[in-house]
């Protein structure tokens, strides 16, 4: 059995003080073990992410957890600079999925130490964390309980989540359906908690993407879907104005507890701090889009759209299918007066294969200009 490091300094990328041009991606926490920083620059290297740590004077082994997301082409590459000295190792080109890559030995002076993540390509370099270890044992690479416990211990996070209250209703997922459920329940007098794993509400309709809600709508959906001048939905403002509603932003639900086959509480983890909380209620509404509560509790789940005959739903398709969330390279277009440059992306056809779809182009959030 591999031994885990018992001491050292774990620097989570999501805790960097200045992300620079890097962005926080927290949607794959359950699949790879942590939120991470993403250098999404459309082919132009993004500005550096920086932070400062305090460390005891001494010699440390360094590991960086990164991902080579297209191993045949290595599009997302970056370096790590420590107190002005750039390590020789270039991360994101070792042909491996999420992996703690050893980067050598460094002597730290014993005072503040400055760390810099420097993007080399602008094509989605990914950095999860940096570990300074006193011994030779490498950090745990998995997402099991042992790896989670190791991270908690080094970050000073309690083993048990903080009790953050009891509510009448807990809604998991802050897309349009989740916001609608939370707002309706709050206006009916219920004490509601809404848990959302992103920094914005609205899902695909939020300012992060900007699509207009489709399908059947009602007055609450139309109310939530109005936009501010910056393009964001007014959903957060409406919920903040409700005394019965509490929103937990950037929290990902990772477990649920049952009593006599009924969900009694859920646990959630904050994307930036790792703080873990527990929320209780007699009623839970799963608007995650991924049936996470069903999965955590062992309930039967379905993938895609069931047929009309299965449950007698009038709006269901005649035949079942596997349609679900969109998978596309999303982009915005505008007319120009000259030919625009386009970066070389030799891996693109390997990722997209033979799929193409030009629907859903936006000129700005909420305003589509595609077919």
Put a short name on every predicted segment.
Residues 1-161:
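Extracytoplasmic
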Residues 208, 214-371:
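Aromatic-residue-lined binding/catalytic grooves and analogous aromatic/hydrophobic interfacial grooves
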Residues 182, 186:
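Gly/Ala-rich phosphate-binding loop of Rossmann-like dinucleotide-binding domains
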Residues 187-205:
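Glycine-rich FAD pyrophosphate-binding loop
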Residues 163-175:
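Beta1/beta-strand and adjacent pyrophosphate-binding region of the FAD-binding site
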Residues 178:
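N-terminal Rossmann-fold NAD(P) dinucleotide-binding loop
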Residues 128, 168, 282:
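Conserved acidic residues
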Residues 67, 174, 197:
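Cofactor-binding loop segments of dinucleotide-utilizing enzymes, especially the Rossmann-like FAD-
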